[in-house]
């Protein structure tokens, strides 16, 4: 059984069709790439899966449970975490405090509800993740004082705090330098080797080809292709 299954997902904004009957499945431990031009529906699909938007039609199943239209809070607690194109941090809080505060019902700009993890276990997990990401030495720094690449790492770490079964990354490499891209790719691959499941939106085709085992292509709200990196490279769209 697929870990995440999307069936005929459709989203309309007034007369505009942002998604049209898109179906795909994600297997446990998979690293799936989602590509397509701007406006192809990639982020809209993420938003419908994670409860930020309600789909106009279609269904989303997670571990066999229909989660279509459930709130972002419920989806998050079921085990699906995500990052946004716009980094979601609390700038006047320390790096460690950012890790200990989970945003529920993210809208893309705001945390509409907050849940702070307390206790030694939560702190230990936060510190272990910061160590893994290479920013443990910044634990007491304000998030606003971090470089953009460091903020990307912190945002990624916050998504990992809930021990999610699926992590959806929206343009994780956007705006970062080549060294940080290699760093992020290495972290994603290591976590995937540990059993974490990823769905990644990414415009950097070199990254997608090296990172993902399977790629789905969207265009104008429709799924138009699927294959391995080699198959997609052989049949450019």
Q: Over which residues does each language-model region extend?
A:
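The feature captures the beta-strand-to-loop junction immediately N-terminal to the Walker
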Residues: 35-37
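Helix-to-loop junction immediately C-terminal to a conserved catalytic motif
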Residues: 50
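Conserved ABC ATPase "signature" region
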Residues: 100, 112-141, 186-189, 237
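Catalytic Walker B motif of ABC-type/P-loop ATPase nucleotide-binding domains
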Residues: 167-171
